[in-house]
C-alpha cells in the first residue's frame, strides 16, 4: 500500500509540474475562492481545473496512421497473430501503419469497446527482416499489462508531458523536473528491459539484437537526415517520391551507418534530466541472453500491396508539411544531385560570417576554429542557432556542440571541396575524400576538436596546398 501511495504522489507531482499554467491558475482561483467563501469558493477552482482537463482531452490526438485489415495483408496479420499467441496475448490486435520508423501499442475505444491497436512504421515493414519485425511486435505486445493499469498510463503521460516541457515555454523548473523524472525512470527502464526479454524469447536473441540496433539506426536517420531532405526539397517546391528507396540506399552507405551509430550514442548519453523512457541501446543489448551468434533470413515480411501503402505514407508526410495541394512537384531523389535535398554549403558559410562578425568565409572559419580552443564555442553556437539559449542549462552545452559541429563541419568540408577534394557520400556533405588519401568526416573532426580544445588537425587540412593529401 505504501508503494502505491508513493507512486500516486509521484504521478500527481509530475502531472502538476507538467502543466504549470493549469496548476498556477488553480492556485489563483483557489485563493480567490477563499475570499468568496462557501459554494462559490469551491466551484471556482473546480471549474478552472475542469476547463484544463477538458482542454487536455480535446488536444489528445486520435489514433495515428492507416488501418491494415487482416484480409488486406495476410502475411503481416499471420505474423502478428503468431507473435501474440507466443507471448500469451489472447486478445485481437488491430494494425495501423504510419510513415515514420516507430512502433507502439495502444488501447483506444473502437466501436465503443476497448481494443488493442498495434502501430507499426512503414520503414520497419519495408526494411526489417521478418524475425526482426517479430521481435519488434513481441516487444510492443509485452507492454499489455501497463496499458491496463490506469496508474501507469497516468504516470507515463505525465512523464511524457514533463519531459517535453523542458524545451517549451512556459519553462518548467528543470532541476525539479529532473528529480521527478529520475524518481520514475528506473521503473520505466525495467519495463522496457522485460519487454526486450520477451522479444528475445519469441524471435531469438540474434533477431532481438538486430531489431534493437536497426530500429535505433532508422530512428536516428529519419530524425537527423531524412527530415532535412524533406524540408530542403520542399523549400525548392519539390517532394521526393522515392523517399523510402533513398532511405534504403542511405542505410547501405557505411558513412551513414557510422554517423547514425554516433548520433544514437550521443543522444543516449545526453539525459541529464532523466527524461528517457528507454535505457541506452548498449545496456539493452547487454541485457539480452548471451548465446552464440546466429544468422536469420534477411527478407522482410511479404506485403501484398506495398505500392498502395507506401503511396499513402508519402501522402501523409506531404500533408504534414502543410503545403497547398499540388504546390510540391514530385521528383526522384536518388536521381538528383545533393543540392536537391541537402542544405547548400553557402548557408553554413553565411551563418558563420554572421555569428563571428567577419566578412570573409575564411576569416569566419578561422574565428570559429579559434573558439574551439579558447572555449568560446558555446556562445558562437548560440549565435548560429539562437534557440540553444532557451534550453535548460544542462542541455545547452550538448546542443551547442551539435549545432556548431554540423555548421563548421560543413563549412570546412566546403572549403576543401573548393580545393579539389570530392564528396565521399552523397548523403553527408561533411564526409569528403582528398585527391589521394583516406576519407575524412569533418563533423567528427570538429567534434573532436571541441572535446579536446585542439583545432590543429582541422587547421592543418585547410593549410594544405590545393589538391594535396
Description of each model-found segment:
Residues 1-9:
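Cytosolic juxtamembrane N-terminal segments of multi-pass membrane proteins
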Residues 173, 177, 181, 205-469:
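Cytosolic-facing loops and C-terminal tails of multi-pass membrane proteins
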Residues 10-34:
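Canonical alpha-helical transmembrane segments of integral membrane proteins
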Residues 56-157:
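Peri-catalytic and regulatory segments of divalent metal-dependent proteins
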Residues 27-49:
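Hydrophobic alpha-helical transmembrane segments
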Residues 146-174:
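Post-HEXXH active-site segment of zinc metalloproteases
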Residues 19, 23, 51-59:
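Alpha-helical transmembrane segments
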Residues 81-84, 138, 187-208:
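An active-site-proximal "capping" alpha-helix that borders the catalytic cofactor pocket
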